[in-house]
Amino acid sequence: MNATCRLIGPAIAAALVLLPSLASSQAAGAQRLAWLQGCWRIDAGSRIVEEQWSAPRGGTLLGSSRTVRDGKTVEHEFVILRETAEGRLAYEVSPSGRAPTVFTSISLDDAGVVFENLQHDFPQRVAYQRKGDDLLAWIEGPARNAPGQLRRIEYPYRKVACTGEP
């Protein structure tokens, strides 16, 4: 048996042992955000923001949101949050019919997740943080007209029943 054959056998055995654990750690990525599933809402006078997330399945969560002002939908988004081959999460968002933008997770724990895309103009970061029974989402990036400054917009959601009623 030559040296190459002696190395390939153990390498294949190691791969067979490690692949299931790699797959389960990736599955755990989407599963760690199971607390995000359900319906979330912000009431701010004549403006209502609603966001809804599916349960994590198949390495994905699906999300949608809309902003209604004075009884008219003025913004909407569709999101797929998916596990990547690199073991991270990708946040692919299509806002109000525009082309999708992908952000990649830079931080993930049981209390929240932060996604980043430094090539995007604004936002460059998108985050979801669990706050008890509430949810704080935020977006952040360079402030327009203020070089070197960050602009951050927060969305303090409260959990609501997914009844479909106003």
Language-model segments: which ranges?
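N-terminal secretory signal peptides that target proteins for export/translocation
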Residues: 1-5
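Edge beta-strand at a domain terminus
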Residues: 100-105, 110, 130-136, 140-166
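Exposed beta-sheet edge/beta-hairpin loop segments within beta-rich domains
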Residues: 126-128
